[in-house]
């Protein structure tokens, strides 16, 4: 079985997108500082509701069989009117404190597949690593990518009927904070 078939048949996208809907409508998450917590929980949801394992390694986020998968996700990734099969530019690699260039990132393979989840449009697309690296562009603080029709395979994930968690994550975080600081 390949990764595309795995994504199309063995991921409970109703629950994954239920987690997404819950996190992005949670009024307790109101600042950019909350983005890391939300992204991490979406990764954990994909791990829990599939056989794709979250490993959170440098250069890739998941493993499935012998494949390494880098996940990128965002709201409003695909154009709505201009070209619905094209994405806006999004960051795929960060320079951080490294002295790397976009050309360096084009040469270094750290994953086999780039998995892109469009959170609002509920679309899941996959790009083969070598092709993804050929599309890297210079960004302010890292390598950016913009996908066009033909650059990716769009997974057929069917109609999504989100199943939301019964409680908001921000509430659980508040409870954990209170317990942690209660000494």
Annotate each PLM feature:
Residues 1-183:
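Nucleic-acid endonuclease domains
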